[in-house]
Amino acid sequence: MTKKVGVGQAHSKIILIGEHAVVYGYPAISLPLIEVEVTCKVVPAESPWRLYEEDTLSMAVYASLEHLNIKDACIRCRIDSAIPEKRGMGSSAAISIAAIRAVFDYYQAELPHHVLEILVNRAEMIAHMNPSGLDAKTCLSNRPICFIKNVGFTELNMDLSAYLVIADTGVYGHTREAIQVVQSKGKDALPFLHALGELTQQAEDAIR
């Protein structure tokens, strides 16, 4: 049984400190941006959904349909997003979350949180090749978090009398390419990654 329209939403995020080093097991602090959202609507279509393997949205829908064991699904997605793409604000993770929620809503299927995380991370593998999991975790959280890859995360009580200015330079970022650049540096990158990890720990101590 399906609905006429399936709807899913998700919010964006911003990394305060620890960008890229988090891929290598160092901590990062990330903040959810609750008011910057994306909405996905799943509606009926005349032809079956087609998979485009380089597209995060397509992979998120495919992973959802595969999990639900639905083949030749005649659906299409409509995305309405206030999250700028390629700006480090978790656009791909948020779109994946919204799309997965919309597909499950359309088919009126239960979506446990752990299943949502698994499906989002599958889609993120396509977008970023070797994601830390930080984007997905923050876009699924309503609180700031300190995150360590393959270890876990802790929520932070952040009550600071301060402002964080998020400015758009107009320059696109490419997470996959940035990760590849760091990888190409090999051992030469390790001192910088370690230093960034220490700065993140100092920032967490200051916040606490």
Model feature map: region roles:
Residues 2-17, 21-23, 30-34, 39-71, ...:
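C-terminal nucleotide
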Residues 75-87:
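Short pre-catalytic strand/loop immediately N-terminal to key active-site residues, enriched for Gly-Thr
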Residues 89-112:
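DPxDG-like acidic metal-binding loop motif
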Residues 114-116:
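Alpha-helical scaffolds flanking conserved acidic
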